[in-house]
Amino acid sequence: MSEDGDICPICKSSRYLNPDMKFLVNPQCYHKMCESCVDRLFAYGPVTCPHNGCEKILRKNKFKTQIFEDVAVEKEVDVRQRVMSVMNKREDEFDTLNDYNAYLEKIEDSIFTLLNGTADEKDALTKEIEAYEKEHKAEIIANNKLRDEEDKYEQQKEDWMKEQRKANYLMAVEEQRAAQEDKEAAKRELVHQLATSNKDASSIEQNVQKTALKRSSARTVNFQPMPTSRYFEKVKKESSKPETPFTPFNGDRQIPALFEVQDHYDDKVIEPLAHDIQHQAGGFTLKAAYARILQQAFFGLGVDVQTELLAEENGNSNGTAVPVKTEEDPVKLEEPSIQVKVESTV
């Protein structure tokens, strides 16, 4: 805060001489003055703002501590809170998302007018908001109450998830410590058996490794991280028409599939990848790779885009592929599946 900001414009007191001095503002005009001036000037009721040129009538109970250093930001936050406490309709109260977005845009326009509009525009909009608040008082109170409950729910969810993350972290640390202890115990056991047993070293090492593996497996089963959000999942209202992007293929919704993945293919390109440790670490499997290749090969067979769009416009689309059966169509969609066996390199 600047040096001028540390001096009360009314009594000229300085925060340098009074470090505990607090500055207050009134939402009527947002002129700043110290707490002592507020107590002194407004002790006997409403008084005109003591700042030169300001004719606003101020009340003592309306003064509040200034949160933001910039008064313009302070004013915008207060105006936004007042407007949104009245215009507080929820998204589920509108038929379409466009209607809800238009309502949000109207809120922003109202806030902008109250901040930057002319005096006549501000007065007209203020009267309009007051009339709306009076007419829809019950709905406004209900929505504000519901919003407070949701905020409380979100706070509880955040606190609960924070506790779960902390508990999972402690469990992971404990599991890591136990794994290190088992590793050191296995080393000591190996040294002890090599020194005392008459068996060959390879068999002793295998037995020690088997024992260590059993301990590790048992510890992994016991170590189960707690869920982070399962008990706080919200039930979302399903819309009558899901807003999903249109795909001209619809291969991901063709049931049953037009192919069947075989257990083995004579493939010299993809098959060696199954033995690569880097691919194995990422979860690579041959069957999943072949299934993806065949899915791409059969993507959209038997689907006519124009027919599907026409069915959707007529309200008959159920989200599945709409095949067009012709005499030249080589794909028979009536069959549950088509056996496909790739003999050459995919």
Curated annotation (Swiss-Prot):
An annotated GO cellular component: transcription factor TFIIH holo complex
One Gene Ontology molecular-function label: cyclin-dependent protein serine/threonine kinase activator activity
Highest rank taxon of the organism: Eukaryota
Basic and acidic residues composition bias: residue spans: 325-335
Keyword entries, A-Z: Metal-binding, Nucleus, Transcription, Transcription regulation, Zinc, Zinc-finger
Residues in RING-type zinc fingers: 8-53
Classification via InterPro entries: Cdk-activating_kinase_MAT1_cen, MAT1/Tfb3, Znf_RING, Znf_RING/FYVE/PHD, Znf_RING_CS
Single GO BP term: nucleotide-excision repair
Region (Disordered): 314-346
Functional summary from the UniProt entry: Acts as a component of the general transcription and DNA repair factor IIH (TFIIH or factor B), which is essential for both basal and activated transcription, and is involved in nucleotide excision repair (NER) of damaged DNA. TFIIH as CTD kinase activity and DNA-dependent ATPase activity, and is essential for polymerase II transcription.
Protein name: RNA polymerase II transcription factor B subunit 3
Protein species of origin: Yarrowia lipolytica (strain CLIB 122 / E 150)
Originating gene: TFB3
